[in-house]
């Protein structure tokens, strides 16, 4: 077995250059880099604006393995006049407050959240406006709810209680109060990491009403709209992107069921949806497409708990009109075969899952096949350019995440009933005998000699360990491994052809691999206008041409030099 192991990706925003060139950007707008905004501060003297935001959770009901090692919160520094992004800083926790120092080129940032059971965690960051580097200056995690400069040396902060068990007893009112303190330093531009002690946060207790998230976001959106001088709203999560034969680009995104962009880069149509589309399957003739729409099992509307039905719709590619929808009793993930057969696998049953099959010209499922349980980390296996319908199935129906096999489903076997054929174990190394997660992939090779190239990860109780992410090429019939490439960060998307496999990671890195032998052609961290971006979806549209959908809602039309 030949293979290549490349070093881990890093979270530094100093990226190497590579051969990938962005030719045009669809869905671009100011403040894209920070996602959904949470707080805004403007400094007219410096001509800068600081924005805290949230890029969002990467998983959905059909694929959840790409959430590991993901930091979704951001602080962006922008110019007031040109709205160009100067710096982007990651945060481990939600960003509550940002404040420019009255004289020094720094910004103080307060972050944090409740861990759901005990502690109010967070940190105080100092961001250097000259270098873009950030320093966590407090020792120990503590949620910082608000901050403002009282003078050049004094920073007034409002912090949450350490935890919800003061004195060892649960306090149900802990979220209703906070403590205010003044931190003093002679030079805040030269404060060492971890030098602010927890006892410095001891101060006066006060009532503190945490604002509703919707109100916080609404105020921040209004502030950014005022800066742009026109209506503004965030874009996030381009979950799927594809190109039609006529050059149009079709995509689905957070809050967007589907949208179409003309070859000249102008938006042709857009169907809005509170949840948004997750998968696109373009039908033969390219007149319409199936869209898999994400729906939560239930949500609160005011004080009422509302249950939402799963949704898969068929839309016209001419105008985006919804032509019909499928009645479903479960959320699903879509898998398509090259000849047009479509499979819908149920995702919200851990033991009694099913597979529904739709003919290439069909309008609704005709057959259901028992396939066992599904969960988004273990069983996700979206294989593109495939001559078969591939899935992951657990040997033990009571514990379907264990001993998973790659199986294929024949929609029309000889006896007239759909057939599930067991192909080979997902785990190819009997000595390791690991618990493997699934991931995206493609089928390559000629007729009669087809191989699978797919991503995945080796599970460990300690979390995702370095080197436990993999991309592997395997015989489509027997599962024999031809090559393996390992990595440290989860795979968000994968596509390719007979020459090159392109793999996107949630670290922001894109890696090109020789399809034949697994050697790495090149690797490059994705940047847009000099700032980091994270690829979430990608499609090869031709030799050396890619469409990349980003976590921050942009679509990148790229070529490889």
What are these language model-derived features?
Residues 3-36, 81-83, 211-236, 478:
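A short helix->beta-strand "capping" segment at the edge of beta-propeller domains
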Residues 23-31, 84-89, 133-138, 226-233, ...:
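A short beta-strand motif characteristic of beta-propeller blades
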Residues 28-64, 96-98, 230-255:
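Beta-strand-rich domains and repeat architectures in extracellular enzymes and scaffolds
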Residues 34-41, 91-100, 140-152, 194-209, ...:
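Repeated scaffold domains used in trafficking and secretory/extracellular systems
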Residues 49, 107, 155-156, 249, ...:
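Hydrophobic beta-strand positions that form the internal "hydrophobic ladder"
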Residues 54-56, 112-114, 160-163, 255, ...:
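Residue-level signature of beta-propeller blades and closely related beta-rich strand-turn architectures
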Residues 58-72, 115-122, 165-176, 252, ...:
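Short, solvent-exposed loop/turn segments at conserved positions within beta-propeller repeat blades
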Residues 158-162, 167-186, 532-561:
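Blade-level signature of beta-propeller repeat domains, shared across WD40, Kelch, NHL, RCC1
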């Amino acid at each position: 077995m030949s293979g290549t192991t490349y070093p881990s990706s890093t979270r530094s925003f100093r990226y190497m250059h590579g051969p990938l060139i962005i030719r045009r950007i669809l869905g671009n707008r100011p403040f894209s880099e920070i996602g959904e905004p949470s707080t805004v501060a403007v400094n007219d003297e410096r001509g800068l604006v600081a924005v805290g935001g949230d890029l969002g959770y990467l998983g959905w009901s059909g694929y959840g393995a790409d959430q590991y090692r993901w930091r979704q919160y951001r602080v962006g520094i922008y110019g007031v006049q040109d709205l160009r992004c100067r710096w982007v800083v990651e945060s481990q926790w939600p960003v509550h407050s940002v404040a420019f120092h009255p004289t020094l080129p720094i910004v103080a940032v307060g972050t944090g959240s409740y861990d759901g059971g005990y502690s109010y965690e967070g940190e105080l960051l100092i961001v250097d406006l000259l270098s873009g580097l950030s320093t966590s200056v407090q020792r120990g995690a503590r949620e910082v709810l608000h901050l403002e400069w009282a003078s050049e040396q004094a920073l007034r902060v409002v912090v949450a209680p350490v935890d919800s068990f003061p004195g060892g007893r649960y306090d149900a009112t802990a979220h209703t109060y906070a403590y205010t303190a003044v931190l003093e330093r002679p030079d805040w531009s030269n404060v060492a990491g971890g030098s602010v002690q927890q006892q410095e946060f001891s101060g006066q207790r006060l009532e503190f009403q945490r604002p509703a998230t919707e109100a916080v976001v609404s105020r921040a959106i209004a502030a950014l709209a005022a800066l742009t001088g026109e209506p503004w709203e965030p874009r996030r999560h381009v979950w799927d992107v594809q190109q039609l034969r006529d050059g149009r680009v079709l995509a689905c995104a957070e809050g967007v069921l589907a949208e179409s962009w003309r070859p000249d880069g102008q938006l042709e149509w857009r169907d809005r949806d509170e949840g948004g589309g997750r998968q696109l399957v373009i039908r033969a003739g390219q007149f319409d497409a199936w869209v898999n729409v994400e729906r939560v099992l239930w949500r609160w509307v005011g004080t009422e708990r509302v249950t939402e039905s799963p949704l898969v719709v068929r839309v016209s590619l001419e105008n985006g009109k919804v032509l019909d929808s499928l009645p479903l009793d479960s959320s699903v993930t879509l898998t398509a075969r090259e000849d047009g057969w479509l499979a819908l696998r149920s995702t919200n049953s851990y033991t009694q899952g099913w597979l529904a099959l739709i003919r290439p010209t069909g309008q609704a499922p005709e057959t259901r096949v028992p396939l066992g349980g599904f969960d988004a980390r273990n069983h996700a296996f979206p294989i593109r350019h495939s001559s078969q319908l591939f899935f992951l199935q657990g040997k033990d129906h009571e514990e379907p995440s264990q001993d998973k096999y790659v199986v294929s489903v024949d929609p029309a076997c000889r006896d007239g009933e759909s057939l599930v054929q067991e192909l080979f174990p997902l785990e190819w190394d009997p000595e390791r005998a690991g618990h493997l997660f699934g991931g995206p992939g493609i089928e390559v090779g000629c007729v009669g000699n087809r191989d699978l190239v797919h991503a995945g990860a080796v599970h460990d109780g300690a979390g995702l360990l370095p080197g436990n992410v993999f991309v592997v090429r395997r015989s489509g019939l027997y599962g024999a491994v031809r090559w393996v490439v390992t990595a440290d960060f989860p795979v968000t998307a994968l596509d390719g052809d007979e020459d090159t496999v392109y793999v996107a990671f949630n670290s922001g890195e894109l890696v090109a691999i020789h399809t034949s032998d697994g050697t790495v052609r090149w690797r490059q961290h994705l940047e847009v206008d000099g700032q980091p971006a994270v690829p979430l979806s990608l499609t090869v549209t031709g030799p050396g041409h890619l469409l990349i959908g980003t976590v921050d809602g942009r679509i990148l039309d790229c070529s490889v030099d």
